A protein has these predicted regions:
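Residue-level recognition of single "structural anchor" positions
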Residues: 1-237
């Protein structure tokens, strides 16, 4: 197959295929550079292209799901232009069609989460706490804490979601905590990669990923591009 959709890529298809296979084997850019003979900078550029396609794939599933409007997330077309750098790294976790899904939350703080956990009806109904109906848990990627929202009445089958989200959180922490001083502009890409790897852990990831990068629409997700642009612009300001 042709790998021309890896925009900006200048390597022959054979090398693109090799990088993709080694990416699926979960090797680092340094390891792949040593094996393939391609510079680490170039490998990292391809990593970003691959992760962007994965993020678009995950977001396409979220947007197609017509999630409840009460989900106060930055993933909808209306919210992606918000400035995520000025907000803590909080993500909502929920189960959708048997898969773990994640969404960056733009209007929340630790105090709000604790009030939600404590079922502070007065604060919630009074509007001082944002409503996150539909989420099973909220993850704080600053302090690496997971807050369960088992008091949320808008979520079905909480007990069924418990093992999946617990497994996903362990998987994600083990992958991301090894990064030191991760650029916040790449955090969403890494979280979406974790989401993808966890949800397809029982599948042939190379086959799934090959299908993703051969689909033009996953390289033209305007909502995701706006989201990434907001990260970049805010960091440069």
């Amino acid at each position: 197959m042709s790998y021309k959709l890896l925009k900006g890529g200048h390597l022959p298809d054979r090398k693109c295929r090799e990088i993709l296979e080694l990416f699926c084997d979960d090797l680092t850019a340094t390891q792949i550079a040593g094996i393939s003979g391609v510079s680490r900078v170039t490998v990292n550029n391809y990593f970003r292209l691959i992760r962007s396609a994965i993020a678009s794939f995950c977001e396409a599933g979220l947007l197609a799901g017509q999630r409840s409007h009460t989900l106060d997330a930055a993933n909808s077309a209306v919210d992606v232009t918000s400035n995520p750098v000025d907000n803590p790294a909080y993500y909502g976790f929920y189960i959708y069609k048997g898969k773990v899904s994640t969404a960056w939350l733009k209007n929340i703080c630790q105090a709000s989460i604790l009030q939600l956990q404590g079922k502070d009806d007065a604060a919630i109904n009074g509007g001082s706490v944002p409503i996150f109906e539909g989420y099973h848990a909220i993850a704080d990627f600053n302090d690496w804490r997971l807050y369960w929202l088992d008091g949320n009445t808008g979520i079905p089958a909480f007990s069924n979601a418990l093992p999946e989200i617990t497994g996903f959180w362990k998987h994600t922490k083990s992958r991301l905590q090894k990064f030191r001083g991760m650029n916040k502009s790449t955090l969403d890409l890494h979280i979406k990669e974790c989401e993808f790897r966890y949800n397809f852990r029982n599948d042939d990831i190379l086959t799934v990923l090959t299908g993703i990068i051969s689909t033009p629409r996953y390289f033209k997700n305007e909502a995701y591009e706006n989201y990434a642009t907001a990260y970049k612009s805010a960091r440069q300001s």
